[in-house]
């Protein structure tokens, strides 16, 4: 992962990169980093080079030069590129270049739901106006299939989350729906609002049984049969993922880099999380749902000051989403026109039963509003 630049032309309400500066990676630094990472990788290994900002396409010339360098120097290796963009700069020359490289360069779009939701979350830095109308959504859907839409839900747009998912999917995009992590979810009405939205999504996916679930609800429930491991992690931060800042310093991911942590990032230079275990005194360590929980070390650090301790409100949100996913998956299994369920279906139903019993405990009475069956 290369943090090509830190500057951005938007001022998103929830952005976790709160220490943005004008730092831009030089091509020489990029070459040095890439050479160190790629030199000893065998030709059969698939490698992904992720280019991120800020808004990455503010450094479009650098991106082109990086891709050109890697394609020439490492042409025998299986290397692909990925990038997430706010889309406002993807026009003209940028579109032509991306079209020409579409088989190896894959781009995700930050799109926060309906036009209103997106504009509420993602205004331009200079004008304060919404950025939705500056995005050529059709270009993305015509260039890649599928296209991931990173739909971030903020406290202000939570009450419209279901409509946002429906809109994104109606535009031919895959909804990678997540909750904003650069802020704390302390509004007392958030839980009740989320329950209402999950009910709507349950009904939506019941009416469209062939649709793939949005990321928020696309949960492998069978994973709860895996014994919780203290070294479990939802992503590869500090293990299979290395993030390099403009100076070429290595961090576990962008959430631990200077653009996010400022001076505190010095504590995580070269940090290796491969041997990290959750402390015994954290609720997550023995949680039955650890293997299906989308926890994030960087988000934990931002919210609680401890990479191993999740914000309590996120625990509640994640359990609600697991319950909603269980409801949808239960209905889909039971709708199958067969007299005998497969072994996989039986395992899923058993997982659902456990989720129901565990979440509907005296400690979670507020979840009774979302019946499983």
Question: How would you name each of these model-derived features?
Answer:
Residues 34-50, 59-182, 186:
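Radical SAM/AdoMet-radical enzyme domain recognition
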Residues 245:
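Short, acidic, Ser/Thr-enriched surface-loop or helix-capping motifs
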């Amino acid at each position: 992962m290369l943090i090509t630049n830190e500057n951005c032309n938007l001022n998103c309400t929830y952005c976790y990169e709160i220490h943005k500066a004008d730092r831009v990676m030089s091509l020489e630094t990029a070459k040095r980093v890439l050479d160190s990472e790629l030199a000893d990788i065998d030709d059969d290994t698939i490698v992904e080079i992720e280019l991120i900002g800020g808004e990455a396409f503010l450094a479009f010339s650098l991106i082109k030069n990086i891709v050109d360098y890697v394609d020439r120097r490492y042409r025998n290796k299986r290397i692909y590129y990925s990038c997430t963009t706010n889309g406002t700069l993807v026009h003209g020359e940028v579109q032509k270049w991306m079209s020409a490289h579409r088989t190896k360069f894959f781009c995700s779009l930050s799109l926060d739901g309906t036009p209103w939701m997106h504009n509420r979350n993602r205004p331009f830095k200079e004008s304060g106006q919404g950025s939705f109308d500056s995005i050529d959504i059709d270009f993305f859907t015509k260039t890649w299939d599928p296209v991931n839409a990173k739909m971030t839900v903020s406290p202000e747009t939570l009450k419209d989350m279901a409509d946002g998912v429906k809109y994104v999917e109606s535009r031919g995009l895959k909804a990678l729906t997540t909750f904003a992590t650069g802020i704390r979810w302390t509004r007392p009405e958030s839980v009740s609002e989320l329950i209402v939205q999950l009910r709507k999504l349950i009904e939506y996916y019941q009416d469209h049984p062939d649709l793939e679930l949005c990321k928020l609800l696309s949960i492998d429930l069978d994973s709860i049969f895996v014994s919780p491991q203290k070294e479990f992690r939802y992503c590869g931060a500090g293990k299979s993922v290395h993030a390099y800042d403009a100076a070429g310093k290595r961090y576990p991911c962008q959430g631990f880099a200077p653009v996010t942590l400022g001076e505190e990032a010095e504590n995580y230079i070269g940090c290796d999380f491969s041997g990290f275990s959750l402390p015994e005194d954290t609720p997550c360590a023995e949680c039955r749902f650890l293997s299906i929980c989308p926890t994030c070390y960087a988000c934990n650090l931002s919210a609680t000051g401890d990479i191993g301790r999740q914000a309590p409100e996120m625990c509640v949100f994640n359990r609600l989403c697991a319950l909603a996913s269980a409801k949808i998956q239960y209905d889909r299994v039971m709708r199958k026109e067969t007299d005998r369920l497969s072994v996989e279906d039986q395992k899923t139903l058993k997982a659902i039963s456990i989720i129901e019993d565990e979440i509907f405990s005296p400690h979670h009475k507020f979840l009774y509003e979302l019946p499983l069956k």
